[in-house]
Amino acid sequence: MKIYNTYSRQLEDFQPIEPGKVKMYVCGPTVYNYIHVGNARSVVAFDLVRKYLEFRGFEVQYISNFTDVDDKIINGAKAANMTTTDFSERYIAAFYEDTDALNVKRASQNPKATEFIEAMIEFIQELVDKEFAYVSQGDVYFRVSKSKDYAKLANKNLADLLAGASGRTDEETKLKESPADFALWKSAKADEVSWQAPWGAGRPGWHIECSVMSTSLLGETIDIHGGGADLEFPHHTNEIAQSEAKTGQKFVNYWMHNGFVNVDGEKMSKSLGNFTTVHELLQVVNPQILRFFLATTHYRRPVNFTDDALTEAENNIKKIENAYRHLDEQAESNLSALTTFRNDFVAAMDEDFNIANGMTVFYDFVSWVNKGNGGPEVKEFFDQVLEILGIKFKFEQSLDSEIEAMIEARQLAREVRDFAKSDEIRDALKAQGIVLEDTKDGVRWHRE
């Protein structure tokens, strides 16, 4: 199995720290609003990675955090006349509701930043003691000048990174030794949530949170760290700097970054105002369709969010569902053909989780199933791919029985050449969104 490592910009053979086990950390949301489709891309992409690793037999310890203390949370809580805890818990609950609907497997743990404040203070103090960090009027900053290969993850020089960071480095530069230095601890402001630390009351900076939660729960070195491509700098760059300064060990063996969801050629983001929340979208779009749309493009590639793309996803799901509905578990099949499908799917996915190539194999498999191939082994592989994709079909047995009865009545009408009755039943089914197919093996049906 190979993974594209952002740090080296190369495909690398995947060798976990402990054979058969994977330690994986994915940056989660800052919980001040509903997640939008762009946020969901990262959640779904790494859910697919996790599920494929499990399919391949790995035991995955999967950690994804909630940032529940932040300027946006503080401001949102004030505007809503709520505590920061109640405000963030509202959107944590919404996150679970949205991601459950998208059939995302719950993380092994979803730590909250506020649960690790003491550990963050200890982490920062150690950096101060080692002179990797310094105190300035109650704030604590990391000395970037002491970090070896600081800009390597983003594959740029430091000057370029600072120029392209879209204001994210815009802190109180007058308190810093260098404009490149970043905050580990921010001194308390009036009417803001704060904690007591050796340098005075305050709260942690954004970057320290993930380093502390990752090393606390997974250890000093982990296998995979994932997140959106926009996190390469400064967030992941700073995570590496502060973590390796503290531990003296390599922080992450494989860095993975997903591509953006684009709208009219621009990244979907709250700052641009061109976003659609998952909460809103699921009022009008089946969660399966959104899941399929997000899951079936290779994770490193951008995806364009359009009505046509959702329609294409819906049509493809219908084809897959139709094949799955009519799969005969009692049928006999050429198992060597099934083995070829399975091996080809694994070969595609083993190349940096290339689901786009994997889907080409899967669509060929679906066509093969539609030709009458079935049996328990065929159903097992079908189920395994659906699990990786995060698709679950729920067939309403009572409704299915009613449809089958109408189909049988239509067949009897055809046998006695009562074509008017036959057409009447067909039209009645079509009005319910049921399309009939007359095949040499009998009548099959699927939903429009």
Curated annotation (Swiss-Prot):
NCBIfam families: cysS. Zn(2+) binds at residues 27, 210, 235, 239. GO terms for molecular function: ATP binding; cysteine-tRNA ligase activity; mannan binding; zinc ion binding. It comes from the Bacteria. GO terms for cellular component: cell surface; cytosol. It is an enzyme of class 6 (ligase). One of its GO terms (biological process) is cysteinyl-tRNA aminoacylation. Belongs to the class-I aminoacyl-tRNA synthetase family. HAMAP family: Cys_tRNA_synth. It is found in: Cytoplasm. Its cofactor is Zn(2+). The keyword Lyase does not apply. This is Cysteine--tRNA ligase. Keywords: Aminoacyl-tRNA synthetase, ATP-binding, Cytoplasm, Ligase, Metal-binding, Nucleotide-binding, Protein biosynthesis, Zinc. The gene is cysS. A motif ('HIGH' region) lies at residues 29-39. The keyword ATP-binding applies. Binds 1 zinc ion per subunit. It comes from Lactococcus lactis subsp. lactis (strain IL1403) (Streptococcus lactis).
